[in-house]
Amino acid sequence: FHKAKVNGDRSVEVWGNGTPLREFLYVDDLARACMELLLNYDDSAAINIGSGQEISIKNLALLISEVVNFRGEIIFNTEHPNGTPRKLLDNGRISKIGWIPQVNLADGIALTYDWFLAHYKNGGTP
């Protein structure tokens, strides 16, 4: 989306039809979860760390487009696969010890894009 915006492209292509659901977690939330587990979890059972929120690829593309300020068209290319219909972790164990993510998806994307702009001035070249 950034490259398309900078290049003045009229559209961005996204593979599939946009219906698959995905879960995302901001990196600082992952770091906080790891610290919480190091300090407060001594069980041997595996534990998932996730946001517990899912979003369709279509809505994710719209959100990224908004954050990047890309005003072109998003084209969903159904000649390419959708992938797995749904990916959402069970956060039950980590929730029981009181951890919850602090950064929502929209804020996480905005923070990540701001970081990208600060570190990659030439659209991907450090």
What residues fall within each predicted segment?
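C-terminal substrate-binding subdomain of Rossmann-fold SDR/epimerase-dehydratase oxidoreductases
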Residues: 1-126
